[in-house]
Regions:
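Acidic, polar-rich low-complexity tracts and alpha-helical solenoid repeat scaffolds
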Residues: 1-205
Length: 205
C-alpha cells in the first residue's frame, strides 16, 4: 500500500488535475491510507475528493462511497472519531457535516460503540435536527439508551421524538416530500407512542 500511496500522491499532486482519472486517484489514495490504518489521513483525503466533486472538479460517481469511508475512517479512531471530526470540520464551510455525523454514528452503532454512537447522533441533532435521516438516528438513540439500561432517559427522549416529527414540526415541513423519510419518522413516532404508556404503566405497578 505504501507504493500505491507514493504513486497516487504523484498523480494527485497537480493542482489543476481534474476529471475521472483524477477522481479515481484521489479516491484510491484515501483508500490506501485507510488500508494501512492511517485513518485521520484517509478521512482528510476522502474529504478532499468530496469537496472537489461538489465543486465540479471531479466526477461525483464515488461520492456516496467516499462519504461512507470518511465516516468509517473517523469511527475507527480511538474514541469513535466524533471529537476528531469536530476539530477537523470546525473551520470548514461544507454542507455535509450533518450527513457525516449521521454516518459516524451508524458506523459506531454497528460496532457496538454505543456511547460514541449517541455522541455522534447528538452532534447531528445539535447542528441540524431537520436532517433527512434524523428519525433513524433518534430511533437508534432510544435503542441504545435501553441497551444501556438508561430507562428514564429513554422515556424522556421518546417525548422528544414524538414532538420532533409530528405533522406541525419543522422537520416534517422540510422533508414531507420524501416518502421514505416520512415513513421512518412515522415509525419513530409510533414506536415512541406505544412505549411511553407501557413504561409509565410498568413504573406505576
Amino acid at each position: 500500500f505504501r507504493d500505491a500511496i507514493s504513486a497516487y500522491n504523484k498523480v494527485t499532486g497537480f493542482q489543476n488535475l481534474t476529471g475521472k482519472e483524477a477522481a479515481l486517484a484521489m479516491y484510491h489514495l484515501a483508500e490506501s491510507y485507510y488500508n494501512i490504518a492511517e485513518f485521520e489521513t484517509a478521512a482528510v483525503k476522502y474529504f478532499d475528493y468530496i469537496v472537489g466533486a461538489d465543486a465540479g472538479k471531479y466526477p461525483s460517481d464515488l461520492r456516496a462511497e467516499a462519504m461512507d469511508f470518511m465516516a468509517a475512517a473517523f469511527s475507527d479512531l480511538e474514541g469513535g472519531g466524533v471529537e476528531e471530526a469536530e476539530t477537523f470540520l470546525k473551520d470548514k464551510k461544507v454542507s455535509f457535516k450533518d450527513s457525516l455525523y449521521y454516518r459516524i454514528g451508524m458506523k459506531n452503532k454497528d460496532h457496538d460503540r454505543n456511547e460514541e454512537a449517541v455522541q455522534s447522533f447528538r452532534r447531528l441533532m445539535a447542528i441540524n435536527p431537520n436532517y433527512i435521516d434524523a428519525p433513524l438516528a433518534d430511533i437508534a438513540i432510544v435503542e441504545i439508551l435501553i441497551l444501556q439500561q438508561k430507562f428514564d432517559e429513554a422515556q424522556e427522549y421518546r417525548y422528544t421524538v414524538v414532538k420532533r416529527y409530528d405533522r406541525n414540526s419543522s422537520w416534517y415541513k422540510k422533508n414531507q416530500q420524501y416518502p421514505a423519510s416520512v415513513k421512518n419518522a412515522e415509525s419513530a413516532i409510533r414506536s415512541a407512542m406505544l412505549d411511553i404508556p407501557q413504561y409509565d404503566h410498568a413504573q406505576a405497578a
